[in-house]
Amino acid sequence: VTLSDNSRFVAKPVSHDPRTDLAIIKIDAGDRVLPVIQLGTSGDLMPGETVIAVGNAYGYEHTVTRGIISALHRTVQVSDVQYYHDLIQTDASINPGNSGGPLLNIDGELIGINVAVRVGAQGIGFALPVDKVLSIASDLCSLRRLESREHGITFTSLNNREQGLLVSSIEAGSAAQKAGLKPGDRIQRVESSNMQWPLELEMALLGQKAGQNIPLSVLRDGETLKLDLVLNASAPKATSVADRAWTQLGLRLQPLSASQLLDKKSKYRGGLTVTAVRPGSPA
């Protein structure tokens, strides 16, 4: 990973979503404090609004282009694997190398991630809304996905400019229920970290030891409560054969029964049909 001052770091992949081609990577910068982009919201965007796209178009670093939001809620299919819903359409110039770059509002806040451009057309580019990006990132960095553990909390919305995470439901028997959390609570802090996005909660809980008290500051009916969340030990990861075939080989497989093979006049009593192949995979 190369930063704007040309300092370089080796990145470690954490998690990846093949449907949107979004990935979480991690770098070790030591004691250095890295600048971060300010997050906006895509919940109040309007056609005609000015936007700014940043990227490495054709290898030209830090290319900045300006345009407007042309439309919202677009659907675009890039490949058999990548199928985007609810995209932002913009006429800001987006070229090869811009993919993965930020789409900003006039306040410099992140409102989307540039993901696609209409080949052969001018002024038609697409970005994944930041609220969707945060939802995907929260799942990619979740306790459930990375450590096979559950906190049992569901939140109402990602479109949240107020401090705190509004709890919509609590899973029965979960760590959250045992801690005393209830629907309607607003989680303001985990340990000493302020909470605004569910992704921040997942990041704060990752790596916490089993049985350790994790202090929460919770607002309930105008009163601030102090609760302790205790996570269980990691459960063994159970990965299905179908998931391994897709992630490692790039194959989607459908079992064939003996009767189906009989119709095909096959000498075998069972088998698999290839229903999809991931582009660029070993298959």
For every predicted segment, state its role:
Residues V1-P183, R189-Q212, L219-T224, V230-S259, ...:
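Serine-dependent protease modules
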Residues Q260-K267, G271-A283:
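C-terminal soluble interaction/assembly domains
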